């Protein structure tokens, strides 16, 4: 009986494995993939400050970003920002970054 319970427990855990996979962490992805340019002191932050004013320089603090806009800029680039392909930043990661940058504040 005990052996049967253990086998069933392992089978249930194995079946639930993919469903328990963690969703991408938007903040961690932003820091890792975008932070070199878009955190304090980065080139992207500097350029946005010059173009849009200091209030809009830090992406994490902006309230006027939308997810479609973030995704479009990342995929196609804008001004001096290069585009990022799906191989460089998969759609699921881009979705997580866009959700992080447009979260309710």
Q: How would you label these PLM feature ranges?
A:
Residues 15-29, 45, 67:
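Electrostatic cytochrome c docking/interface patches
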């Amino acid at each position: 009986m005990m052996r049967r319970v253990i086998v069933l427990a392992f089978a249930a855990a194995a079946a639930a494995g993919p469903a328990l996979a963690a969703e991408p962490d938007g903040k961690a992805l932003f820091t890792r993939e975008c932070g070199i340019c878009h955190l304090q002191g980065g080139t992207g932050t500097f350029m946005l400050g010059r173009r849009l004013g200091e209030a809009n320089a830090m992406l994490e603090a902006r309230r006027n970003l939308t997810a479609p806009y973030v995704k479009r800029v990342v995929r196609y680039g804008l001004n001096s920002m290069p585009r990022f392909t799906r191989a460089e930043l998969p759609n699921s990661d881009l979705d997580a970054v866009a959700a992080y940058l447009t979260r309710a504040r």
